[in-house]
Amino acid sequence: MKVTLIAILTCAAVLVLHTTAAEELEESQLMEVGMPDTELAAVDEERLFECSVSCEIEKEGNKDCKKKKCKGGWKCKFNMCVKV
């Protein structure tokens, strides 16, 4: 009887520890709503700048603005890179 009780208590303790660890992992992987993703914002600003500069340089040379700078799901529109 003692062995069965010890086994049940051990199993319960392991279950509690496992559940707690899983909850902590889930919380650490969630993003907080309202926090800006600064890395994505920096990439967006960089693409906007590259596209604007590229278009302006090509327009000054009396050529049509060729949209070469925006790649990877982005396109140049109104001298700005926009997500497609």
From Swiss-Prot:
Alphabetical UniProt keywords: Disulfide bond, Neurotoxin, Postsynaptic neurotoxin, Secreted, Signal, Toxin
Subcellular location: Secreted
GO CC annotations, alphabetized: extracellular region; host cell postsynaptic membrane
Region forming the signal peptide: 1-22
GO molecular function, one term: toxin activity
Top-level taxon of the source organism: Eukaryota
InterPro entries: Hwtx-2-like (IPR012625)
Keyword Disulfide bond: yes
Family named by the database record: Belongs to the neurotoxin 12 (Hwtx-2) family. 02 (Hwtx-2) subfamily.
Function: Postsynaptic neurotoxin.
Protein name per UniProt: U4-theraphotoxin-Hhn1a
